[in-house]
């Protein structure tokens, strides 16, 4: 039985259906995230905060600290969530950054349609040459391996003579190793053009029909060419890239802090639901002929609070664990100057370099400090995280050492390190 890939039209239809699905999923998940945030906020102010007040009747400062901390978390979560959703990957600011990046990299950006067509032709010719050269090298390497294998086979193989009733017979040809077995030719794998381009090299986007800056990719869900594209996030209903990566990381950070804080507040009330104190409250309240179940123990909920406590605790634990893993991964990416797409490409480059007995280095890695500044700016790092701000990025999308990496309006500011790049393997 043979299998064949679907036709191009069918593949395009399937891709369009999946893109539409993820787009609609984003609308649902944004609403779902709003429900989660609203539910946890309600649980704190109407269930958990009264517990804290009853347990600390003579310590209003402690209660005020809890309220202030929750307000601080809410402001940062909501503001960064909104800024990440509303970030635009096109428009005047995008065009401005593109021109600044072209000037910094010495790229002559085509302005007229004729210039764009000419650049597209030149780029395609350059890519065809590189792909053909790469395929030729693979063919040469494969031929060398076959020659070595055939030479070894010829030295070790031979005809085995057997004598039966005085006659010499040859061994079974089926068992002879000298006869080469037919091998099915493996189909050539498609080559991603950005993997054979230089780290500072501009490309061309066949979908949006415009020059493609380094580190940029076309997002098929939002139909935009995104600078420093990391991934499309349906929870954000947007693509995470150059203009909103800071907001995305901040949202993950404060979500992890908020979920950890919420789990620490609700774990005892949640575990107390099965305790003796919980049932004693119900029994004593009924013995006193009270219309409602009374609170008689600190941080022990009553039946009508049980659902809110269970909802808050289980949600904080599950969401907190999931977001913690994601936040840890993106912290690693941020400090090593990688996007999620580049992370997978760098893994492939490391494997290729290892086969060549070489060591691969990410060409965008300027050191942890400068990598952090590429996203958060050269100002106070703590203030850059805890104070929500919609300021424009301070550095160019492409990490460049020294003052050349700053956008023109930021040249001369603090933080002009002179870290040197180590060229990668191309």
Spell out what each predicted region is:
Residues 2-426:
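Membrane-associated feature with strongest affinity for ZDHHC
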